[in-house]
Amino acid sequence: MRVANIGDFNGDGVDDFAVGAANNGPNGTSDNGAAYVVFGASGGLPAGLTPGDLNGANGFTIPGASFGGSTGDLLGNAITGVGDMNGDGFDDLAVSAFYGDPNGVGGREGQAYILYGKAAPMSANVYPATLSANEVSIISGGNFDSEFVNDISSAGDVNGDGFDDLIVGAFRAADPNDYGSGSSYVVFGKASGFSATLDLS
């Protein structure tokens, strides 16, 4: 399980947090994964808040994908607040899916999602693949079975352009058969964000 302060994702003046649960899965699966975003509240949060209580107004769930059987994409293996990458005044969130597969065949390429903050309410369940380019950017670039995105981190504003940036770690980026062939990628924030998909290969 991973927990991260993500700043003020919904712009209400109170900081929010996110929980990544990469081995969570419904209906007997164990590794679809999920991430849960919980909006802070000026009066505090209720005791005993569960994922099922997140309704879009107080937070939301990002469900992971299944490739059949017990195989899933391990969404939530890394999660972080990334500041305001697109300069719209809302803090943003990045979450990785270690086995994320753009082709849906269990290839374990690995993906990450930048979800751009916005005012609540929103859907109780948020599926990155169904969102528009001003709501999400999907980062990929791995080879088959390369497990591309094993870690992500906020980088601050490393190029001094006024937009926050992101670092993506890929521990088998150069060769999916070599665990020592990793690379890191710095993704510079910019006005209006990126296209719906961002290929780092």
Q: What would you call each of these model-derived segments?
A:
Residues 1-201:
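Conserved beta-strand/short-helix segments
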